């Protein structure tokens, strides 16, 4: 019974995501990403539902149903070891789950530092793509009917490393040449880390790091230890954080659809609870005193 129900749920998500695949991608740097101008316009590679050869970082907007949208926004960074993006299972399926919570999702295609011949770095280029995505969403908040003070990041595995690099580290100084979007804050209002990798865990968490929801499997030798370490650092710094470690669970259980364990299957419900408890799912909610960024950039 449970297997059949999960199969139907996965099939429905697959069909929905096939339609969602037609959604346009919004390029974050129309004239080419800094340092990647020579590869601007180069075609991506898609094998099954995995994407690689990304040189023009972009976000695909998956808007929540207008009848239930609450104004929250989440930028999703799929995993894939910085070699490819697990676009369906850790991108579009996650977007659909957030949409059911009334959240508008922005699925990020970022530059892949370990894609053969890419020449990119994780801490430099890929993290810059995530920061630009946060700024871009804030700049276009009015267009997509989201609250610029309720913009979160969500990262899976390698994407979790990017989320941590952006949320839990100081942003580097801006280059001499910037545009209006670059002048907005790149610090997300909250962070959701799904079996995040070890790169990006700070030596000491900052007291002004955004609230965190962290989830991993207890048998995940890659990503359970950094999940625990980051949680302990955030708590020590006085940052609100919640950690879920699921028993007998390994890596890459995605949004629960790859597991038969009920606790794994229902972990997105715990995320919904956390978002609600933090006030992120209601207009004007979230942390008090967070300044609103500048108006929309046209």
Q: PLM features: residue spans?
A:
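N-terminal signal peptide c-region/cleavage motif recognized by signal peptidases
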Residues: 17-19
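Primarily recognizes the serine-hydrolase "nucleophile elbow" in alpha/beta-hydrolase
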Residues: 128-208, 289-295
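Serine-hydrolase catalytic machinery in alpha/beta-hydrolase-like enzymes
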Residues: 26, 32-60, 65-74, 79-146, ...
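Bacterial N-terminal signal peptides that target proteins for export
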Residues: 1-11
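Short beta-strand/loop motif that positions the catalytic acidic residue
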Residues: 214-216
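C-terminal catalytic histidine-bearing segment of alpha/beta-hydrolase fold enzymes
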Residues: 237-298
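Conserved alpha/beta-hydrolase "acid-adjacent" motif
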Residues: 221-227
């Amino acid at each position: 019974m449970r297997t059949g129900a999960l199969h139907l749920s996965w099939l429905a998500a697959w069909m929905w995501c096939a339609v969602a695949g037609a959604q346009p991608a919004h390029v974050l740097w129309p004239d080419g990403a800094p340092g990647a101008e020579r590869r601007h316009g180069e075609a991506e590679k898609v094998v099954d539902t995995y994407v690689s050869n990304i040189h023009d970082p972009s976000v695909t907007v998956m808007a929540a149903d207008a009848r239930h949208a609450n104004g929250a926004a989440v930028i999703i960074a799929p995993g894939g070891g910085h070699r490819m993006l697990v676009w369906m299972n850790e991108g579009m399926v996650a977007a659909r789950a957030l949409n059911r919570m009334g959240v508008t999702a922005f699925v990020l295609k970022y530059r892949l530092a370990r894609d053969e011949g890419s020449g990119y770095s994780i801490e430099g280029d890929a993290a810059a793509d995530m920061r630009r995505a946060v700024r871009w969403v804030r700049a276009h908040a009015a267009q997509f009917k989201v609250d610029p003070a309720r913009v979160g990041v969500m990262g899976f595995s390698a994407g979790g490393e990017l989320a941590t690099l952006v949320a839990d580290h100081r942003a580097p100084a801006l280059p001499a040449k910037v545009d209006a979007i670059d002048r907005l804050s790149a610090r997300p209002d909250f962070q959701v880390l799904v079996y995040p990798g070890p790169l990006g865990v700070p030596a000491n968490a900052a007291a002004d790091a955004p609230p965190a929801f962290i989830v991993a499997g207890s048998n995940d030798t890659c990503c359970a230890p950094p999940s625990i370490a980051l949680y302990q650092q955030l708590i020590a710094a006085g940052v609100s954080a919640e950690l879920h470690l699921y028993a007998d669970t390994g890596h890459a259980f995605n949004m629960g659809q790859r597991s038969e364990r009920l606790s794994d299957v229902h972990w997105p419900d715990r995320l919904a609870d956390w978002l609600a408890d933090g006030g992120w799912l209601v207009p004007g909610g979230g942390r008090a005193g967070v300044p609103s960024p500048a108006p929309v950039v046209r």
